[in-house]
Structure formats: C-alpha cells, structure tokens
C-alpha cells in the first residue's frame, strides 16, 4: 500500500479540486470522526506520540478533542482540495494549524498521524531538517507544545486519479511559529513546567487564549494588563499566568 503524506507545495497546482462523493468506501466510513471511538483514537495517538518525543519535553500539553476544529477540518476535507485551507477558515476562538494526508488506499487515523510524526527521523531539535528541503512541519505541528486542541475530518474523493483518501487535522492554537520553528517545545523532564497539572508526562493546564504579539510578556510587565492594547492583544499573558501557552 502506497501512502502519500504531503505538504501544500508538493501538491498545489498538481491535483485538481473535486467535492467529496456521497458514495463512501465502507472501510473509510468507519473512520468518520463523528464517532466517539474515532475521536478517542485520534486524541490518544497524538498524546502517545507527544509523550514519546526525544529529547523529552518539560511543557508538552495533553491534547483533547475540539468539536469546532473538527467541523472546520471536515468542511475542508469535503472539498477534496489537496492544499492547505485559508487560515481564516480554520479559526475557532484561536488561530489553528493544519496537517494534511492523502493516500491511495484507506489508512487508519493512527497510520496517518504516525506518518506525520515519523518526519522526526529527518529532524534535529533546535536545528531543523537533517536533509536540505526535507519536510518536517507535520512533525513539529503534532508535537507543538501549546497546541492542545485537535479536530479532524476525512473524505473519500473518487474523482481524484490516485489519492482518493483525504485526511485533515487542525490544531489550536496553531504551532510552527516562525520565530522558533525548530523548537516545538522546551527540553526537560516531563511535566517539569506543570508539576501540579500533570497526567502521565503531559501537562493539563492549557490556555484558552492566545497572545497576538511575541513580546506580550514584556508588554505586560511595562504597561500592565490595565492598558487596552495589552488587555486586547495579550489575552494569554493576562489571563493564563498559571497555564502553558
């Protein structure tokens, strides 16, 4: 079975867009993310892999299912458009990242997620790809420390010539920050950043807000959260002092 996990630049312009067909492949229908057991598989697989990172992470949040992210992911999967969605179309109350997976045969969600994670074989922590131009962005999003909400959707796209099986996961808040792209988490003993909020090596004190500026922590110190700019643009810094964000 040939599997093809790909990024936007690998497929844009090469594969046309066709809406998903209602005639579902029976095996693929069993993977629909409206089912509780499928949601559980997706969340558990992500958390299994997040616990397994090397070097270990001191601030890795435990993932949980998010219905709004799942609805956005399913809506995009239904388009059978093999490129990344517009960022505005994967907004919840947070900005969300996205991983895509296409396959020539029906794969389990665990296989799809594992394929993203396996990019770690070509990744040096804090440095980047070991091989020039190697794809590692799926891996870094899967293990991005602050991305603790996940929602996924899939579609059967029979009008595509080869890659008929389409999987989309969205992650909130989004990872892969440009200013620390190859440092997806802080190294250290598991849960060192959350000793009172730890579940088997993963932190459980995520923040439902996000900062819009990279210097929000310093803005909070100099202007305080009473300043409207800080209050409106640095919601994580102002509201999540005991959380990981």
Curated annotation (Swiss-Prot):
Similarity comment text for this entry: Belongs to the CRISP family.
Record keywords, A-Z: Disulfide bond, Glycoprotein, Secreted, Signal
Tissue expression: Salivary gland, pancreas and prostate > epididymis, ovary, thymus and colon.
Name used for this protein in its record: Cysteine-rich secretory protein 3
Signal peptide: 1-20
UniProt keyword Signal, yes or no: yes
InterPro entries, per the entry: Allrgn_V5/Tpx1_CS (IPR018244), CAP_dom (IPR014044), CAP_sf (IPR035940), Crisp-like_dom (IPR042076), CRISP-related (IPR001283), Cysteine_rich_secretory (IPR013871), SCP_CRISP (IPR034117), ShKT_dom (IPR003582)
SMART domains on file: SCP (SM00198)
Key word Secreted present: yes
Glycan attachment points: 239
A Pfam family matched in the record: CAP
Main location: secreted
GO biological process, one term: innate immune response
Matching PROSITE patterns: CRISP_1, CRISP_2, SHKT
Subcellular location: Secreted
Disulfide bonds: 191-198, 194-203, 207-240, 216-234, 225-238
Subunit structure, interactors included: Interacts with A1BG.
Top-level taxon: Eukaryota
Residue stretches making up the SCP domain: 43-171
PANTHER family recorded: CYSTEINE-RICH SECRETORY PROTEIN-RELATED
ShKT domain sequence ranges: 207-240
Any single Gene Ontology cellular-component annotation: extracellular space
Organism, as annotated: Homo sapiens
């Amino acid at each position: 079975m040939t599997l093809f996990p790909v990024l936007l630049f690998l497929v844009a312009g090469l594969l046309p867009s066709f809406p998903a067909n209602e005639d579902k492949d029976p095996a693929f229908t069993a993977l629909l993310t409206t089912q509780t057991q499928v949601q559980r598989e997706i969340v558990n697989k992500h958390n299994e892999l997040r616990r397994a990172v090397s070097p270990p992470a001191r601030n890795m949040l435990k993932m949980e299912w998010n219905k709004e992210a799942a609805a956005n992911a399913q809506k995009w999967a239904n388009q059978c458009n093999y490129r990344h969605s517009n960022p505005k179309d994967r907004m919840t109350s947070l900005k969300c990242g996205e991983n895509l997976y296409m396959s020539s045969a029906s794969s389990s969600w665990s296989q799809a997620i594992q394929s993203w994670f396996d990019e770690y074989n070509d990744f040096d922590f804090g440095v980047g790809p070991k091989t020039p131009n190697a794809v590692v962005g799926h891996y870094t999003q899967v293990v991005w420390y602050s991305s603790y909400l996940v929602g996924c959707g899939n579609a059967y796209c029979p009008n595509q010539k080869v890659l008929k099986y389409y999987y989309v996961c969205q992650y909130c808040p989004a990872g892969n920050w440009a200013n620390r792209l190859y440092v997806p988490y802080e190294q250290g003993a598991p849960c060192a950043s959350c000793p009172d909020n730890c579940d088997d090596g993963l932190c459980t004190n995520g923040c439902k807000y996000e900062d819009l500026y990279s210097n929000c922590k310093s803005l909070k110190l100099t202007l305080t959260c009473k300043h409207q700019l800080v209050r409106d643009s640095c919601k994580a810094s102002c509201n999540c002092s005991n959380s990981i964000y």
